[in-house]
Amino acid sequence: GWQGGMEGGLAMAELLTGKGNPSGKLVDTFAASADDYPSTANFHESFDYVNYTEDIYVGYRYFETFARDKVKYPFGFGLSYTRFQTESMGLAVQGTEATVIEKVTNVGGMSGRETIQVYVEAPQGKLGKPLRQLAAYAKTEELKPGASEELILKAELTELASYDDSGVTGHKSCYVLEAGDYIFYVGTDVRSAREVGRVTLAELQVVQTVTEALAPVQAFKRLRPFFFGENKHAIANWEDVPLRTIDLAERILRERPTQSEYMGDQGWKLADVYDKKITLEQFLTQLSDEDLICMTRGEGMCSPKVTPGTAAAFGGVTDGLQQFGIPVACCSDGPSGIRMDCGTMAYALPNGTLLACTFDPELVEELYEMEGMELRKNKIDSLLGPGINIHRNPLNGRNFEYFSEDPYLTGTMAAAQLKGMGKYGVTGTIKHFACNNQEFKRHDANAIVSERALREIYLKGFEIAVKQGGAYSIMSTYGPVNGLWTAGSYDLLTTILRKEWGYQGIVMTDWWAKINEEGEPGSGKQTIPMVRAQNDIYMVTADAASNSNKDNTAEGLADGRLTRAQLMRNAANICCFLLRSVAMERLLGREEEECTELHSPVSTEGAGDSGQVLARLELPEPKTGEEIELPLEKLSTKKGTGAVYQLRFTKIGRYELVFRMSSTLGPLAQLPISVFLNNTLQQTVTINGTEGKIVEQTVILAIRQDGEKYMKLYFGESGIDMSRMFLRYVGKNDIESFRNE
């Protein structure tokens, strides 16, 4: 769907009344039936796997090549209250860059904007190609009736290269431009685009030689076009998909870093690296093995160490790490605005699909510059977005969060968001890397994909975001690709991402993700392959220091499956992120003055209902361990409601507020409760859906002064069934050091 954010209703009113003129374009092909999409046949073929048999023929690449008659509304189609006339001013080629100039004239009676799109038909060669591939797009300014604008669109020929995963061209594991005519089409959608010129290559050109990576290990067949005579409509043909030929275990072992040392505390802080007094490598030699292991664990959700109600804290999450001056960074859901489960207000932005329909990266960059300002105001270092998976099938339940069926449009839109947020020193975490193309069984369903389809379709948007948008935070997926859960996929996260693309940043798991050794089932405790693959941070744990998730990283270090050097490498990735983050500037007190002014007090009072006083309780002198029941008769746990208990404390000390609760929702549901004392947030706790099982959560309250206090509970989502709630007196021990005094 096209969710318009908090201003979407006003925009719709302007369009319906004629005050504004629509200029959006479809980012997906609309066919007559869901059954017309080639991926539908295997979309729910199995609970255990998904065969990507359509290969690179996704969306308009399929329909324009094989099934033009099935299309109701083509990719790039849009409506306007005015009419435009377009005129080609020619095609020019210089080096590897093709330039198209298109004149657009408003010949209607109302001001409006138009989008021009450039598509290329590559020669079929030995690999087979779609008949259309988006290569460039541009949008006019608002043109008054009779006004014209010349748009200059540039397309890099090397970006049109195809990946040879079989060696059929004689150049296996290479991106190649096969010999023949590259025909350029220009128009206002893929179907109406007309030929404006050709570029002819006399012989095959190797654009880039890479390494075989992430090839499938299970045999299946993939679609390729067969053309008969002069017929421009392809017939579906099928070929065997090339399988992995390299020894992955040998590659991982051969490339394993081994050099590291432990020098103990030398008195250096991360600020010394920031000030270029020492190198990062020198700094990391001070960290013990336990420190390095703790850095691989993010904490959440709703960690009290960062902005209340956010998704996770990472970096300096333990006392030991903070002693070395390592800051704690904060990340928050996204992508359509900041999510703070304590009820703090934030702007709701249009979703990814709607933003992509603008075909206007400059506008998107401007919007996300403002989002960057809001992130900085709330002391959030990364928004968990944009989501940039491909619209492989219209039945994917999360398509609204992603941009398009086209990887080029996807990548350029993601790059625009990252550039916008970057102007305020914050960033987005692009997700889900890669092939999160369905929600059903996404924790376990194995995506079986050819290496060519991965590189040309499903990884391409991420590659553009890294190379053009400067991405430096990425989230892997829940599920496996070609047998390996992505959170521990070495070829995905090291061979392709870091070695080929030159990525310098962090990778985090999705929340409570699984990882596996090849051939074994996935588990959230199996973090050894995660560390090896340079998935730097496991999201999330309740407490990094105590290994609350019971991961096996320390076990792997002890028995040689991991090295200290691998842990140091991942810690370096995390520290590099922190060194360029606002969290580091805040820790050092070095934020620019105009940025510190952003940190005006942000309300942490729960949104929605201010809360009905459910009970007034006098708490007599409690004994240590004594439990004081809180009545539940009038308690509502509906989303957005607040419940207030008026409590008179007669004894100072530490109290435990204990919730015993359940939810009939499934384990993907996230259900937060925020606890306030006299309108000051104490803590937000989050449970997942328990499928009816009762669980317990505890919030510590430090009562430093006797007398009356108002305790408010704010429920961020519906679905909690509270079975019991009580206060337990703990005593006065350590109250001076308790952080929530």
Regions found by a protein language model. Give the residues of each.
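Glycoside hydrolase catalytic-domain context in secreted enzymes
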Residues: 1-192, 210-642, 646-656, 672-696, ...
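Extracellular and select intracellular beta-sandwich modules with Ser/Thr-enriched
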Residues: 193-197, 697, 721-723
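Extended, low-complexity, turn-rich repeat/linker tracts enriched in Gly/Pro/Ser/Thr and Asp/Glu
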Residues: 109, 662-671, 719-720
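Short beta-strand elements
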Residues: 192-211
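Catalytic-site microenvironment of enzymes
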Residues: 659
